[in-house]
Amino acid sequence: MTTLGTPLSPSATRVLLLGSGELGKEVAIELQRFGVEVIAADRYANAPAMQVAHRSHVLDMLDPQALRALIAQEQPHLIVPEIEAIHTETLVALEHEQGQKVIPTARAARLTMDREGIRRLAAETLGLPTSPYRFVDTAAEYREAIATVGLPCVVKPVMSSSGKGQSTLRSEADIDAAWDYAQTGGRAGAGRCIVEGFIDFDYEITLLTVRHAGGTSFCDPIGHWQKDGDYRESWQPQPMSAAALRRSQEIAQAITDELGGWGLFGVELFVKGDEVWFSEVSPRPHDTGLVTLVSQELSEFALHARAILGLPVGAENGGVIRQSGPSASCALLAHGNGVPVFDNVAEALRDPDTALRLFGKPRVDGHRRVGVTLARAGSIDAAREKARVAAAALTIQLRD
């Protein structure tokens, strides 16, 4: 797709975002730069991407009839899933029946909507190294899986994100509570889980991998720190050996080639020395990649937009994704109930090498990521400290 029309006209190039969170918002902004007509959909009103789209829709995207009706109404040239909670079988059917273009492919969206599809593809079809694992449906199977993979281990619902329903088990005392949490924390409610054995890794990375008209390109590896399964900080580049980087790129190329299509993929990997294990892959921009808003000339969102439109990403003919130096991000979390209000914004931006993105989440109920601070410096450690200082300067209030 190298011809682009004018939005809100008969020539418009229409893109439907299925999911309208903070990552979708940045993708929408990048698409708008190319005059693309953006339609944003999610299960709640005033989601971040809706605030920068030409129009929006609120629906349950797990409802096949509602999803079909939306696509029939909007007639998009591209459907861009931005979350996992979508009735992906409908996308597969529409791709087959009508030639509907799904990014990167409907099959990729279906395989990555839960942990089982992508884990079986990676480990059993492609033979990629992974942690030991078992899938379970009942409490009895869960206990058998723990006995097989051993402690410590991790249990996660097959359908969840941002650490919801995820627990680390270090002793038998953790077993019952972890199962109960997994049955209440997943997107689909009680159900199937994965039990994963622990890998004694040195660090974990996200390797942003771009499939585009000119081939496959890699961003510098992104290191990150998680708490309770949710991203809290990320930085780029993550130092690693040449052998580990080469192996990481081989694994990322294998899984993204199998998924196919164009767009950006977030490939998560565990690294110990020169050894690398596959963890997960998202066929879309990744939350740890928010750091690329300052660390790269083209952010992960700009790369995704360009790739899906068939435009150059600046790394053709053996080139590389250009970096801007050591950079870091720090997530802003709000806890409680209400509409977020941010104080001390000027203080947070006092350092000229810092930046801030407030996502525009309409409300917080419980805890929610509502923004991110970003920083550049002469070293990763210095950039991380700057991002933390900026985050600490902000005060987040929740008002009714």
Swiss-Prot record:
Residue sites binding N(1)-(5-phospho-beta-D-ribosyl)glycinamide per the record: 22-23, 82, 287, 361, 368-369
One Pfam family assigned to this protein is: ATP-grasp
**Example GO biological process term?**
'de novo' IMP biosynthetic process
Is ATP-binding included in the keywords of this UniProt record? yes
- Give residue ranges for domain ATP-grasp: 120-309
Q: Which GO terms describe its molecular function?
A: ATP binding; magnesium ion binding; phosphoribosylglycinamide formyltransferase 2 activity; phosphoribosylglycinamide formyltransferase activity
Q: What is its EC number?
A: 6.3.1.21
Per its UniProt entry, what is the enzyme's top EC class, as one word? Answer: ligase
SUPFAM superfamilies found in the cross-reference section: Glutathione synthetase ATP-binding domain-like (SSF56059), PreATP-grasp domain (SSF52440), Rudiment single hybrid motif (SSF51246)
Any one cellular-component term (Gene Ontology): cytosol
Q: So, what pathway does this thing act in?
A: Purine metabolism; IMP biosynthesis via de novo pathway; N(2)-formyl-N(1)-(5-phospho-D-ribosyl)glycinamide from N(1)-(5-phospho-D-ribosyl)glycinamide (formate route): step 1/1
Enumerate the UniProt keywords alphabetically: ATP-binding, Ligase, Magnesium, Metal-binding, Nucleotide-binding, Purine biosynthesis
Tell me the residue numbers annotated for binding Mg(2+). Answer: 268, 280
Annotated ATP binding lies at: 115, 156, 161-166, 196-199, 204
Write down the chemical reaction(s) this protein catalyses: N(1)-(5-phospho-beta-D-ribosyl)glycinamide + formate + ATP = N(2)-formyl-N(1)-(5-phospho-beta-D-ribosyl)glycinamide + ADP + phosphate + H(+)
- Family designation: Belongs to the PurK/PurT family.
Q: What does this protein do?
A: Involved in the de novo purine biosynthesis. Catalyzes the transfer of formate to 5-phospho-ribosyl-glycinamide (GAR), producing 5-phospho-ribosyl-N-formylglycinamide (FGAR). Formate is provided by PurU via hydrolysis of 10-formyl-tetrahydrofolate.
By its UniProt entry, which NCBIfam families does this protein fall under?
PRK09288.1 (NF006766), purT (TIGR01142)
On assembly, the entry states: Homodimer.
Identification of the protein by name: Formate-dependent phosphoribosylglycinamide formyltransferase
